[in-house]
Structures are given as structure tokens and as C-alpha cells.
């Protein structure tokens, strides 16, 4: 590698990669994703991985005799459910991903949004219970970890100044992290991107188009939250955000090489 290559490598922005959905229940999917991440990191592209774990949370709540309720695509989080949700996300989900990363040869660090003062967190809406919203605060810990060549794996659990453990939507957590490190944002889901009313992939969307598709019910529930998070970053940072599928992990490498994958949310 030439000095020019090294300089180009050093200038690569951090890729904030949000994963979730059924990925955590698919060993092959996790393996392929982490192998792709290993190649990307080896090329000099730093990655922060952010995750939810809704499927596991649903399972754990059901096992504990608790009901899952959602409002506009966001999980309602009563105080009684917090121990289960925190355990599923910051515990089992985080360590499951960390194990897959280590198996793929990725040096990684499991953490949450509450670590090292990286985020300010508060309750989003009393109607949602202990659901949090976060704002970027201090990137120094993440910068230290990334400078070591390690991959942070961040669960979407935050803690408020009042000491409340809060469940943050993982797409919104990824948005805040992308802003914190001025990075590019890729939101991976169970589907290949945003689909139209006929189930066909939409290659590119702007706010006006999103508003229209939301109005007619094509974009709804969890995808609505995801697209709104993507628009937030696209507009505030002036760069496109990708929504793609974890099922096609090789596309991440293509994305790093400048190719478009999934749906691009335009500023």
C-alpha cells in the first residue's frame, strides 16, 4: 500500500451500521455480516455497529408473561418491563453479536449508549413509558476505541441524568451516533430497502416522496421510524443514508466502493 493509499484510508468517515430484526436469530446471517465487517475494517474503514433486538425482546417478554405494545412503530416500555428489555438488548443481543464478531476475527467492544457520557438521554414521551431519546454529547470514548482499530457494538439502552434506564429505538440511536462521529449511516433491516405498494424496491427517496408514501400507507410502522431517522441524518449532515438488508452482507463492501445498494434516502 502506498502512502497515498494510507492517506486515503485515514480520511474514510466512520460507517455507522445499524443491525437488528431477525439477524440475531440467524447464525449464518451474523457470520456473513461480521466477515464483511472484518474486510471493511481491514481496508481502513472504521465501523460502529448499533443494534436493537426486538425479536428477542418479544420472546423474553412473552416468557415472563408480559405483553408487547407499540405506538407508531415504537415499543411502549412500562417500568416493569425494563429489566427484561435491558437484559435482552444490553445483555444477550449485545454479546451474541460480539461473539459473532470475535469468531470472524473482529476485535470489538460491547457497550451501550450510556457509556462514557457519549449521549444525553431523556424520556421521549410519557405515553411510551421508559422510551428514551438521545442527543450527541461526547465522542472522545468512541474516538479512542476507533483509533485502536476496534469495532464498538452499541446496544440501544441509555440512562438519563435522573438515573432512569431507557429503551431507545435502535434506528434513532444509530442516527444520534452518526451525528456524534460525523459518519455515514447504513440502516440494515430484514428487507432489501423501502418497498413500494407492489413490493418492489425503491432506489431513492426524498422527504416529499416519503411524505406521500406515508400518507397512503406504503411506509408505516417500523419502516416509518427507520425512514424518518434516515431523513434526519440525511438532512442534518447533507448526505444520503442507505437502507438495505443484512441478508446481502456482500453489498456492504460494494457500498464502501461507492456503489448504491438498497434505498438511498436523499437530503
UniProtKB/Swiss-Prot annotation:
**GO BP terms in the entry:** arginine biosynthetic process via ornithine; L-arginine biosynthetic process
Q: Which Pfam families match?
A: AA_kinase
Entry binding sites for substrate: 53-54, 75, 167
Site positions (Transition state stabilizer):
18, 226
Q: Does the keyword Amino-acid biosynthesis apply?
A: yes
Matching Gene3D superfamilies: Acetylglutamate kinase-like (3.40.1160.10)
GO function terms (MF aspect): acetylglutamate kinase activity; ATP binding
User: Its annotated pathway?
Assistant: Amino-acid biosynthesis; L-arginine biosynthesis; N(2)-acetyl-L-ornithine from L-glutamate: step 2/4
Location within or outside the cell: Cytoplasm
User: Looking at the keywords, is Nucleotide-binding present?
Assistant: yes
Assigned EC number:
2.7.2.8
Q: List the GO cellular component terms.
A: cytoplasm
Kindly state which reaction or reactions the protein catalyses.
N-acetyl-L-glutamate + ATP = N-acetyl-L-glutamyl 5-phosphate + ADP
Name the UniProt key words of this record, in alphabetical order. Answer: Amino-acid biosynthesis, Arginine biosynthesis, ATP-binding, Cytoplasm, Kinase, Nucleotide-binding, Transferase
- PANTHER family xref list: N-ACETYLGLUTAMATE SYNTHASE, N-ACETYLGLUTAMATE SYNTHASE, MITOCHONDRIAL
UniProt function note: Catalyzes the ATP-dependent phosphorylation of N-acetyl-L-glutamate.
Family as reported in the entry's similarity comment? Belongs to the acetylglutamate kinase family. ArgB subfamily.
Please identify the protein, giving its name as recorded.
Acetylglutamate kinase
Annotated organism of origin: Shewanella pealeana (strain ATCC 700345 / ANG-SQ1)
Q: Which gene encodes it?
A: argB
Amino acid at each position: 500500500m502506498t502512502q497515498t493509499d494510507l492517506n486515503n484510508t485515514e480520511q474514510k468517515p466512520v460507517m455507522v451500521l445499524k443491525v437488528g430484526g431477525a439477524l440475531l436469530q440467524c447464525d449464518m446471517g451474523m457470520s456473513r455480516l461480521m466477515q464483511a465487517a472484518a474486510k471493511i475494517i481491514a481496508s481502513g474503514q472504521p465501523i460502529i455497529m448499533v443494534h436493537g433486538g426486538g425479536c428477542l425482546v418479544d420472546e423474553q417478554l412473552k416468557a415472563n408473561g408480559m405483553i408487547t405494545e407499540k405506538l407508531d412503530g415504537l415499543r411502549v416500555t412500562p417500568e416493569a418491563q425494563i429489566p427484561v428489555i435491558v437484559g435482552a438488548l444490553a445483555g444477550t443481543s449485545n454479546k451474541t453479536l460480539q461473539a459473532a464478531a470475535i469468531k470472524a476475527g473482529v476485535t470489538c467492544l460491547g457497550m451501550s449508549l450510556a457509556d462514557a457520557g457519549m449521549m444525553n438521554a431523556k424520556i421521549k414521551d410519557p405515553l411510551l413509558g421508559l422510551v428514551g431519546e438521545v442527543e450527541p454529547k461526547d465522542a472522545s470514548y468512541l474516538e479512542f476505541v476507533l483509533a485502536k482499530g476496534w469495532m464498538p457494538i452499541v446496544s440501544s439502552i441509555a440512562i438519563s441524568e435522573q438515573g432512569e434506564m431507557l429503551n431507545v429505538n435502535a434506528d434513532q440511536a444509530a442516527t444520534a451516533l452518526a451525528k456524534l462521529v460525523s459518519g455515514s449511516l447504513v440502516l440494515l433491516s430484514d428487507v432489501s430497502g423501502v418497498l413500494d405498494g407492489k413490493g418492489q424496491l425503491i432506489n431513492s427517496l426524498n422527504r416529499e416522496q416519503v411524505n406521500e408514501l406515508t400518507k397512503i400507507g406504503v411506509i408505516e410502522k417500523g419502516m416509518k421510524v427507520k425512514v424518518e431517522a434516515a431523513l434526519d441524518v440525511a438532512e442534518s449532515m447533507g448526505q444520503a443514508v442507505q437502507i438495505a438488508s443484512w441478508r446481502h452482507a456482500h453489498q456492504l463492501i460494494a457500498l464502501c466502493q461507492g456503489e448504491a445498494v438498497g434505498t438511498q434516502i436523499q437530503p
